[in-house]
């Protein structure tokens, strides 16, 4: 489920667009509206889609977070994979809209939505640019700092190969990516944010 936001009045010709992934909030109203309404006001189409276990999109992906399902990792299952499939379908829907220029679609989102915008850009080469807003961290932060105990499973694409997000970032290059983090973030270490950004920057050189 989701909402397609369009400029009013609608200009002639196809629009650049933003795919916005919602994070997981206690309410679907108000928490991210200031991040989504800005796009149609600036001439973009914006499709805001619900992540799994949010509003009208049922499911469960909090096995590590609160379900004690550590077997998910050994079985090669990652809840981020389910979220990614959901996000890729949202991208297909948006890119097929007659109002949208499919060559000019960026992705963004906050918290779990930030993680999903990152993974969507990794998997979908048609994404023109990505701006993950928090939600993306290094493997050390995830496991060493026990970040998985404080966040939804959708932020961690661990699986059997135990790949770091820095490895995934290499798959976005050379397309533009801007990481947006909080200096006072208590859930993910700002030091690990810097590690992620510095190593990703090295890939682009």
Regions found by a protein language model. Give the residues of each.
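N-terminal cap/lid segment of alpha/beta-hydrolase-fold proteins
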Residues: 1-13
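Cap/lid segment of the alpha/beta-hydrolase catalytic domain
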Residues: 11-96, 103, 138-148
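Alpha/beta-hydrolase-fold catalytic nucleophile elbow
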Residues: 50, 108, 133-134, 180
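Alpha-helix C-terminal capping segments
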Residues: 98, 122-126, 171-173
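Alpha/beta-hydrolase fold nucleophile elbow
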Residues: 99-111
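Glycine-rich nucleophile elbow surrounding the catalytic serine of serine-hydrolase chemistry
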Residues: 109-121
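Mobile cap/lid helix-loop segments that gate and shape the active-site cleft of serine hydrolases
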Residues: 128-170, 174, 186-197, 203
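Short beta-strand/loop motif that positions the catalytic acidic residue
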Residues: 172, 179-181
């Amino acid at each position: 489920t989701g909402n397609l936001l369009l400029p009013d009045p609608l200009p002639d010709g196809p629009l650049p667009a933003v795919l916005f992934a919602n994070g997981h909030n206690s309410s679907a109203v108000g928490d991210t509206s200031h991040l989504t309404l800005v796009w149609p006001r600036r001439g973009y189409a914006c499709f805001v889609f619900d992540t799994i276990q949010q509003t009208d999109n049922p499911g469960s992906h909090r096995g590590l977070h609160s379900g004690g399902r550590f077997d998910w990792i050994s079985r090669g299952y990652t809840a981020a994979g389910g979220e990614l499939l959901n996000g890729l379908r949202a991208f297909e829907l948006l890119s097929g809209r007659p109002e949208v220029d499919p060559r000019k679609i960026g992705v963004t989102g906050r918290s779990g939505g930030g993680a999903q915008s990152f993974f969507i850009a990794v998997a979908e080469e048609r994404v023109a640019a990505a701006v993950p807003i928090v939600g993306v961290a290094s493997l050390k932060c995830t496991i060493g700092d026990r970040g998985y105990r404080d966040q939804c499973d959708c932020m961690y694409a661990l699986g059997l190969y135990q790949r770091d997000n820095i490895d995934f970032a290499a798959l976005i290059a050379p397309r533009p990516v801007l990481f947006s983090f909080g200096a006072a973030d208590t859930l993910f270490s700002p030091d690990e944010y810097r590690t992620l950004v510095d190593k990703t920057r090295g890939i682009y050189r």
